[in-house]
Amino acid sequence: MARLALLSVSNKTGLIDLARRLVEEFEFDLISSGGTAQALKDAGLPVTKVADYTGSPEILGGRVKTLHPRIHGGILARRDVPSDLTDLENNQIRPIDLVVVNLYPFEETIAKPGVTLAEAVEQIDIGGPAMLRASSKNFAHLTVLCDPAQYDEYLQELRQNNGVASLEFRQKAALKGFLHTASYDSAIASYLSGTQQHTLNGTELQSLRYGENPHQPAAWYQTGTTPTGWTAAKKLQGKELSYNNLVDLEAARRIIAEFTDTPAATIIKHTNPCGTALADTIVEAYQKAFNADATSAFGGIVALNRPIDAATASELTKTFLECVVAPDCDAEAQKILAKKSNVRVLTLADLSTGPKTLVKQIAGGFLVQAADDIAADTIQWQVVTERQPTADELAELLFAWKVCKHVKSNAIVVTSDRTTLGVGAGQMNRIGSTKIALEQAGDKAKGAILASDGFFPFDDTVRTAAAAGISAIVQPGGSLRDQDSVKAANELGLLMVLTGVRHFLH
């Protein structure tokens, strides 16, 4: 008797090729349900609908299709237990040798803006997880596949083992099945419970050479079943990404996501920007960002919000860089970058979308917070000094504020001409960060803008900035001594704007 395969998938990637090989090369019979059966039929493949096999029609608008003893009996039967085989024979149930199933796209659904509870609930799969768990449990006697990435390996197993997948492969596939259902149920529980329950699930994408330091083991995990963010990036050249590369790439992505309307470039070292700039072209933006701190840019991570062209590629090859990421990279640019073969060059079409929540572990638990993604243009800024801003000053203040948001606290950023001139990051007091940023800016601080991620507890930052030639300041406000800083700004002829929003970053 021909072997029997049950196929019921939401993600139909690779389905037809797999099914054709099963039928033509290994003489499987196919049973399937719903849209999967229709896809197989449309491809000209012989398939029996589950409803015809079980004798029970799909009901409740498709909510009940595979929940039937002829399905689950065929999956769960132990081929080495005589009573199980007798039960199959008495109930006219064929043993199922292969189950190919993946689940309704629940996580993709709840990620959509404005999705309703009713829409989310309809994407909670019932029959799929039941089949996935049952077939994973019975891996001693059948194979379960829940990811299109497994299909080719499974076919190779059949070819190398006289048409039967090895026990080692079946057990590995079963583990993947249980991990898949565990992640799926966790996503549902987290969604329905709101803040009461938070579960973080991931599948190891690759082992990393090490973590932040060589003595720290590390790995890269993918959340969800569909590649998004960095798991969807395409590496065009270069060595494997390291833990630190990925951390810095994400820091770069967060900055570049602030700027969509104008070509923008940022260069990151240890998660802080050493240069960020806007310009009319992407090559000009990169040149400005690089020249903002050419010393620190050596060995940096570059993110661009426009495709890499030949001119930009030529500039990128003039110094040592760890990684470059952009939405795309044309063929001529790739040829130029290939001369620096060790540079990791990635393309990621969507550099704007990041995680909505951030997780940090502490002893005995973990902390969860919403991402700091409040849009700068939705904040009601307040001009608190006698001097009022020009349109160009407002644009510069906004640029400085957006960059400062992504600098480790205490953070001070000095900018001019939509380019960072000095970045003071991570100091234990604000005046210390101010002095670092102003020292980097040097004479270019005259007439420039200063942004702070937190309020000024004293007027010393204002006075230090004025002494260096700063013309305008943007900061959250909220100090009991705000008036001291406002008074100093008026006294010294500075413009000051309060945003009312703090951007600490630890």
UniProtKB/Swiss-Prot annotation:
The keyword Hydrolase applies. Residues 1-146 form the MGS-like domain. One of its GO terms (biological process) is 'de novo' IMP biosynthetic process. It comes from the Bacteria. GO terms for molecular function: IMP cyclohydrolase activity; phosphoribosylaminoimidazolecarboxamide formyltransferase activity. GO terms for cellular component: cytosol. This is Bifunctional purine biosynthesis protein PurH. It comes from Trichormus variabilis (strain ATCC 29413 / PCC 7937) (Anabaena variabilis). The lineage of its organism: Bacteria, Bacillati, Cyanobacteriota, Cyanophyceae, Nostocales.
